[in-house]
């Protein structure tokens, strides 16, 4: 279990694209750290690992925004903890967590003005839900089906309103800073980066 969690976190980091990809990799890095040394996990272990992942992701993001993968994962982690308190069965906790994640994902369009304007849900949140569904399928011994079309799509999102907005920054650059010493405070670096 430890090796699988580590490999997943590493693969997600190497394959990360954009903010959501990096956040997803950080979620699973925290998830992986929580499962370190475990040969198997129950629902409580899953809930604790998910909560650790959410905490790691929120800490890493300078300005967390609602209506994103962060919101979907946080609400899912909260639900997993509540579910695990009543029943430590991993399959039950995962199934209930997925239901919460789907509701949270559908609500992202109402929480984030950019998503609302485009009429879409958060792509990172959708990726997170898809990974949870893959975990459940694997746990149940089912093949993880690759879908050509994962659901209803808009023929064409209306991006005409975006063309008139002023763009402050033309590029988004993402860096991952790894600390050799966990006691090092990154806040001064964040303050400096936010000032430039």
Model-identified regions with their sequence ranges:
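N-terminal loops that bind phosphate or other acidic moieties
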Residues: 1-196
